[in-house]
């Protein structure tokens, strides 16, 4: 009498390595285990599929066929052994495909020129992510994260000079890197103008609108203090001659000038 072995035990399958989420890879890998070899069937409403049709006894890695951006929360796998026993239904852990890079744009440029060595800068991003600073001008910031919307950063201390190649990029959680945003060029000038008297008012003088000459290390706006004033409001680099407004006969010992660059 012939004896026929019967296999009525279905394979048991389990997730081993889920799809990275989020991921910018639209053909991601997935690994599962099976205690029997067999044929893989793909299902679920999320329409995941693969060209891998056979499962090993042990671990099987599959590469999913090209997926569009979106959330995949109902991809399933079953394994059918040689005796047509069908395994449990394995639902892949939900994952997100995101192949779209953030878009960043300048909102508020650094004031130019500025005497602030740690100036503010505002830009927008349509995704949250991690900021990377670059460019040959060596601008950096302790602000490392960006929100979806406008983000204000404080640039780390800068020396006086021109900054015309500071860049920002944003990398989202799926590792998509944004366009490179180059900050509008700006100048940091934290050094005040230096003034020196060149030609004092003749003393005494019978001129009620006497001239006065001073030098400035920078262009700027003149501010008068004390009892003296003038219609000249701008200073140039080097020597400047001003005519004081009409003065009464008297002694003038409190006349001051400052220049704001």
Regions found by a protein language model. Give the residues of each.
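Flexible, low-complexity linkers/stalks enriched in Thr/Pro that connect modular domains
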Residues: 1-11, 91-102, 182-193
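Short, solvent-exposed loop/edge segments of extracellular or virion-exposed proteins
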Residues: 2-5, 12-25, 103-116, 138, ...
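Generic structural detector for well-ordered beta-strands
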Residues: 3, 31-33, 63, 94-96, ...
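Structural beta-strand segments of beta-rich domains
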Residues: 26-30, 117-121, 208-212
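Short proline/glycine-enriched turn/loop motifs at strand-loop junctions of beta-rich domains
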Residues: 33-40, 124-131, 214-222
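Extracellular beta-sheet repeat scaffolds used for adhesion and glycan interaction
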Residues: 39-83, 89, 130-174, 180, ...
């Amino acid at each position: 009498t012939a004896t026929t072995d019967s296999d009525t035990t279905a394979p048991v399958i389990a997730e081993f390595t889920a799809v990275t989420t989020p991921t910018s890879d639209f053909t991601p890998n997935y690994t599962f285990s099976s205690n029997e070899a067999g044929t893989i069937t793909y299902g679920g409403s999320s329409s995941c599929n693969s060209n891998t049709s056979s499962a090993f006894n042990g671990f099987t890695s599959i590469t999913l066929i090209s997926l569009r951006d979106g959330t995949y929360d109902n991809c399933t796998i079953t394994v059918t052994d040689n005796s047509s026993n069908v395994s449990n239904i394995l639902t892949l852990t939900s994952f997100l495909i995101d192949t779209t890079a953030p878009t960043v744009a300048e909102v508020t440029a650094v004031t130019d020129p500025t005497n602030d060595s740690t100036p503010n800068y505002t830009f927008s991003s349509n995704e949250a992510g991690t900021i990377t600073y670059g460019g040959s001008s060596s601008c950096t910031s302790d602000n490392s994260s960006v929100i979806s919307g406008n983000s204000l950063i404080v640039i780390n201390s800068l020396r006086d000079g021109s900054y015309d190649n500071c860049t920002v990029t944003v990398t989202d959680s799926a590792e998509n890197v944004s366009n490179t945003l180059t900050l509008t060029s700006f100048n940091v000038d934290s050094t005040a103008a230096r003034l020196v008297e060149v030609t004092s008012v003749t003393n005494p003088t019978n001129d009620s609108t006497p001239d006065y000459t001073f030098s400035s290390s920078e262009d700027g706006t003149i501010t008068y203090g004390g009892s003296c004033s003038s219609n000249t409001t701008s200073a140039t680099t080097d020597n400047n001659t001003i005519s004081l407004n009409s003065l009464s006969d008297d002694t003038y010992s409190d006349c001051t000038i400052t220049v704001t660059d």
